[in-house]
């Protein structure tokens, strides 16, 4: 039986802490109708597989990720999708596109936009105001060491992400 799976780059504690500190300075962060995501679960989704078989997806990712290099990333800026506040991701050195393309499901047509979902909210949540307040954020840079295959389950306060597999990334010279 399949489980809900996706691949992602985890956000390291230093980058998450810097963004949390910046959010604490934002007056709009106290808006009603705002639901924060758990910073310990912050990640950059690379590929979403829906209901899938963990062993088969692990084998597929092992082949697809072999020899790929890790770019240097930074959380910077913010934006809004309908009902979602996200932190932007910039590439400081290297390239993220080859990594994202390698793990995207076959036939995926949506454009990849690297981001971290920070909060969700309804019409009174002030997401646009928060995105504006976070526009100047520039967190510390990091080079991801691994891609995670994560299982997503519904929890009482939001999704719960559990690592299924880990895939080490090569280290490119800067």
What does each model-identified segment do?
Residues 1-174:
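Histidine-dependent nucleotide/RNA phosphoesterase domain, centered on the 2H-phosphoesterase fold
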